[in-house]
From Swiss-Prot:
This is Large ribosomal subunit protein bL36c. SUPFAM superfamilies: Ribosomal protein L36. The keyword Ribosomal protein applies. NCBIfam families: rpmJ_bact. GO terms for cellular component: chloroplast; ribonucleoprotein complex; ribosome. Its main location: plastid. It comes from Pleurastrum terricola. It comes from the Eukaryota. It is found in: Plastid, Chloroplast. GO terms for biological process: translation. GO terms for molecular function: structural constituent of ribosome. PANTHER family: 50S RIBOSOMAL PROTEIN L36, CHLOROPLASTIC, LARGE RIBOSOMAL SUBUNIT PROTEIN BL36C. Keywords: Chloroplast, Plastid, Ribonucleoprotein, Ribosomal protein. Belongs to the bacterial ribosomal protein bL36 family.
Length: 37
């Protein structure tokens, strides 16, 4: 899980979702997991 100021999609499978006011990226590739922090 990467914590970044700006989250963005890295590949086609990445999806932007919002959980409890946090923007997160979920993907089939675990390396692409991100959340805004």
């Amino acid at each position: 899980m990467k914590v970044r100021a700006s989250v963005r999609k890295i590949c086609i499978n990445c999806r932007l979702i919002r959980r409890k006011r946090k923007i997160m990226v979920i993907c089939s590739n675990p390396k692409h997991k991100q959340r805004q922090g």
